[in-house]
Every structure is written in C-alpha cells, then in structure tokens.
Amino acid sequence: MSIKVFSGNRMIDTKAGKVIEKDISILVKDSEIISVDSPEKISSHEMFQNAEKIKLNGTILPGLVDCHVHLIGFGDGTPGDVLVKTDDNLLAINGAQNAIRHLDSGVTTLRDLGAKNMTGYMIKEASNRGIIQTP
C-alpha cells in the first residue's frame, strides 16, 4: 500500500472551473485520491502519519490526455520517408525520451497512433517492465 500527500500552493479545480491560489494538500492511497483539502485538515487524517510527503512547485493540475501522438517522431519536422529509413533502436530511444517529455509537461495518458515496425511495442514493453517511465 502506498500513501502519499502532495502539497502545493496553486491548483486547478476543473470541477469548479477555477484556480485555487492557497496552500492545498492531496492525500492519495495507491492510485486513489482520498482527500483534497487544506494542509491542516489533511495532516489530521489518520493516514497522514504514514504518508510520504511530497512538496510540489508550480501548479497542481489533473493529468492531461493526449489522444494523438507519434512518440518516435523527432519533433523537428523530419518527414515520414526519413523516419522509415531511421534505425528502429534510435526511434525507440527517441520515443522513450518523448514519453518522459510528455510526463514532464503533465500528460499522464496518451495514445500513440503509429510507429515504425515494433518500436511502439518496444516502448510499451520497456514501460511495463519498469525500465522507462511513460504516461
């Protein structure tokens, strides 16, 4: 069982449609959000004492979803006819790096809509084995 408390001072509340500009904490058990409240109220929760405390910088927001990506792309306008001639290993490594970029920008779910040969499956398998992090 994993218990974490994420704390910050700015959060986007998509349900209310507003930005909360005050100290806020989020109590999470495994992958379920248990409570979102003031740090004072969260610290009085019975799970707080055993929780890993994580201080966040920047804005806390719900995970973003990108429904159309091609992870193996270089992002520099390299045309498809060049990508098909590029070594699969290089494309897979580039795809892993692009997955990290997505995570760093707040994307927690994505759908890769096409990759050369088995490179997309290589990235997925590496993620499933815990070798790389992906959304």
PLM feature spans:
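N-terminal metal-binding scaffold of metallo-dependent hydrolase/deaminase domains
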Residues: 1-47, 60
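Residues at the C-termini of beta-strands that transition into short coil/loop
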Residues: 37, 55-57, 75
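Surface-exposed loop/turn positions
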Residues: 24, 51-52, 107
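Conserved beta-strand scaffold positions in the cores of enzyme catalytic domains, especially
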Residues: 5, 50-55
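Alpha-helix-loop-beta-strand connector modules within alpha/beta enzyme cores
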Residues: 125-135
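Metal-associated gating/positioning segment near the N- to mid-region
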Residues: 59-126
